[in-house]
Curated annotation (Swiss-Prot):
SUPFAM superfamilies, sorted: Winged helix' DNA-binding domain
Annotated source species: Saccharolobus solfataricus (strain ATCC 35092 / DSM 1617 / JCM 11322 / P2)
Protein name: HTH-type transcriptional regulator lrs14
Record function comment: Acts in transcription regulation. Binds to multiple sequences in its own promoter.
KW S-adenosyl-L-methionine (keyword) present: no
GO molecular function: DNA binding; DNA-binding transcription factor activity
SMART domains, sorted: HTH_MARR
């Protein structure tokens, strides 16, 4: 599944999109990004609902929501209507503004880190 997005032309001439940058910084795949966008646009969902909406396997959805939870973009809440057996979870995105701020801050942090090592790397023999 390819996520369509705005492309940015880098000084090298290469064009990259947001998913490329998210993949570099967070190891987020196209599928992970599609799951996040779906949750942001459609509200909290279970894995089953996401699998049906996105026409993906539950295993694929499970990997994506676990990645998004570990990164702090999505909260996992136990479904109170779940009776017996394995607990069901509902996945709820954090506020879109918080996600935007987190990603922007992390991009700035990464850029600053790379900028700080350039002088050292250029001087080393």
């Amino acid at each position: 599944m390819q996520v369509e997005n705005i492309r940015v032309r880098l000084p090298s001439g290469k064009e990259v999109g947001l998913v490329d940058a998210l993949n570099f910084c967070y190891d987020i795949s196209d599928t992970d990004f599609q799951v996040l966008k779906t949750l942001l646009n459609s509200g909290p969902k279970t894995e089953d609902e996401l699998a049906e909406m996105l026409h993906l396997s539950k295993a694929s959805i499970n990997r994506s929501v676990n990645k998004l939870v570990s990164l702090g973009f999505v909260d996992r809440v136990k479904d109170s209507s779940s009776k017996g057996g394995r607990p069901r979870y509902i996945y709820k995105p954090i506020d879109a503004d918080r996600i935007t701020t987190k990603i922007s801050n992390d991009f700035k942090y990464c850029a600053d880190l790379f900028s700080s090592v350039i002088p050292q790397e250029l001087k080393e023999k």
